[in-house]
Regions:
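ATP/NTP phosphate-donor binding region
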Residues: 1-97
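A glycine/threonine-rich phosphate-anchoring loop and its flanking beta-alpha core
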Residues: 15, 113-205
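Residue-level signal for inorganic ion chemistry
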Residues: 17, 39, 77, 128, ...
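Hydrophobic/aromatic beta-strand patches that form the interior of the parallel beta-sheet core
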Residues: 65-67, 100, 125-127, 162-165, ...
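Non-catalytic interfacial helical region
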Residues: 85-102, 111-126
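Short glycine/serine/threonine-rich phosphate/pyrophosphate-binding segments
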Residues: 106-113, 134-135, 250
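C-terminal charged capping/lid subdomain of soluble metabolic enzymes
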Residues: 183-185, 282-353
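Active-site segments that bind and position negatively charged phosphate/pyrophosphate groups
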Residues: 198-309
Length: 353
């Protein structure tokens, strides 16, 4: 399956197919006519897929280099950037060369930001290997690194030349990372697709859902494609993709990215903000309970056991907080979301979340 993100001169294809990694060289040749390629990956992913990617690229006539970083959220830091730049310089990559981000969301965001800033920008291709990256972070052109004060505080809008999604790579993912990705899949159903949400709730586990996985990945990517085409720079409808993220980012930060994964934190954020919105009469009653049921099916938590006042200081630094005005994403109902302008006082009295 091939989708196209239509952004004029920044348009790019998204390829979704089982076993497509073996065609990487052919697909890269369609969007890149240079010679050198740097594969940036991590020490979990590269041992699994580095060889097949390097072979297919070499067979297509490319000169391949690789740089492998430690896995995990702490790698997505400002301190990792000089290491990538040094590897690019040592391999003598120029502005006419290409970087491939081979990994999950951390590698995609970090390597994408390195590509956006090295020599004022070189081409890059996303090959996401986690469910979360396949359905969300690899598409849309947001690249970033974290700072101690919060997630994604230094970044850019920088689109890849292509995204190559192989659902087969998910067979090597531990259950924890599958649940992580399902947090974002549930989000898409909540904000834009009631049918998708109901499909998720009709199944009893991820294993039960697996035969429909390629279809579900494609549906999530298509929703994101439509939203990004309408709002490339996050000023309007694209904000809807942040459903659950206001609380999620602060929960992740509070625990130094060592307890809840991103998808788990998004699950907590979606449920808790919907519960608050229902109490304020801003969301149809019963939505929070439906979200909780979906989270239970896919082994995701619904609370962090933190007092809200512990989180509100970090919320004030959130990117969605502009001039002390906070845009939170709420649901009218499942599948129908909207942006609600408020401020940090929205969370007053929420108690333990």
């Amino acid at each position: 399956m091939k989708l196209t993100v239509d952004l004029g001169p920044n348009s790019y294809p998204i390829h979704i197919e089982n076993g497509i990694l073996a065609k990487t060289g052919e697909l890269v040749s369609e969007v890149f006519s240079g010679k050198k390629i740097m594969i940036v990956s991590d020490d979990n992913v590269f041992p699994l897929y580095g060889e097949i990617i390097t072979k297919t690229l070499s067979d297509s006539g490319f000169e391949c280099h690789s740089f492998v970083l430690p896995h995990g959220e702490p790698t997505k830091s400002f301190q990792s950037l000089p290491k990538i730049y040094e590897a690019l310089l040592n391999a003598k990559l120029t502005r006419s060369d290409l970087l491939i981000a081979l990994g999950g969301g951390v590698i995609g965001d970090l390597a994408g930001f390195a590509a956006s800033s090295y020599l004022r920008g070189i081409k890059f291709v996303q090959i996401p290997t986690s469910l979360l990256a396949q359905v969300d972070s690899s598409v849309g052109g947001k690249v970033a690194v974290d700072l101690p004060q919060g997630k994604n505080l230094v970044g850019a809008f920088y689109h890849p030349k292509a995204v190559i999604i192989d659902p087969d790579v998910l067979n090597t993912l531990p259950d924890h990372f599958i649940s992580d990705g399902m947090g974002e899949v549930i989000k898409y159903g909540c904000i834009k697709d009631k049918e998708l949400f109901e499909l998720l709730c009709r199944h009893t586990s991820f294993d039960d859902l697996k035969p429909k996985l390629t279809q579900i990945i494609a549906r999530c990517v298509d929703i994101k494609r439509i939203v990004v085409e309408a709002d490339q720079f996050d000023f309007g409808e694209r904000i809807l993709l942040n459903f659950g993220h206001t609380l999620a980012h602060t929960i992740e930060q509070h625990f130094h990215y060592e307890r809840e994964s991103h998808g788990e934190a998004v699950g907590i954020g979606m449920y808790q903000i919907t519960k608050i919105a229902e109490e304020k009469g801003l969301t149809t009653s019963g939505c929070a309970e439906q979200i909780k049921k979906a989270l239970e099916i896919y082994k995701l938590p619904d609370n962090s056991n933190l007092p809200i006042d512990v989180l509100t200081a970090a919320i004030s630094l959130d990117k969605k907080n502009l001039n002390n005005h906070l845009n939170v994403v709420l649901l009218h109902d499942i599948g129908n979301s909207y942006v609600y302008p408020t401020d940090v006082s929205f969370f007053d009295g929420a108690g333990i979340v």
